[in-house]
């Protein structure tokens, strides 16, 4: 939503929609209802959004959201409004307690916190909070051909500029090829410390 309401301040995404859908499927979710978010949608009141999406759109019977969930114009809707409107429409609404990180003053696990750990290069915390290894998918592009001169295969990846990336540094990683083969890799993000240029 921030890409529409405040594009200059929109945070980078952790996972692209295509990959999210794959993860949903891997975890047994059979149906996903994608809502196109645009300027008109951003100005929709919470009650109108509820009627259009939950009632008329998908004919929901149960709605589960995080206890801090907000929606509608200027985030006017919350779990209490959902429960109120849901009661009128015969929809049961549950607010799910936030998952807390017991190691960091019981702070809630959120995409904002994960992005902060990424910026600090704290990949163990990123992976722990995601519940999976952080990953990128990119197209191999031409580089300077250094790999052949050092006897170690290298690949330069073009990464989507909308994706959040870790702090500059060298990371231990896994690389998966199109054929499904998985190999160990060293990933350098940022400058090339080995070469003067």
Report the location of each language-model feature.
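Phosphate/ribose-recognition catalytic cores of enzymes acting on nucleotide-derived substrates
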Residues: 143-197
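Short low-complexity stretches enriched in small and charged residues
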Residues: 18-24, 50, 128-132, 139-142, ...
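Short clusters of hydrophobic/aromatic residues that line enzyme substrate/ligand-binding pockets
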Residues: 4-5, 140, 157
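Short intrinsically disordered, low-complexity coil segments enriched in acidic
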Residues: 1-8, 111, 176, 188-191
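Short secondary-structure boundary segments
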Residues: 36, 67, 97, 189-191
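Core alpha/beta nucleotide-donor-binding catalytic domains of modification enzymes
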Residues: 1-58
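Classical nucleotidyltransferase
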Residues: 42-153
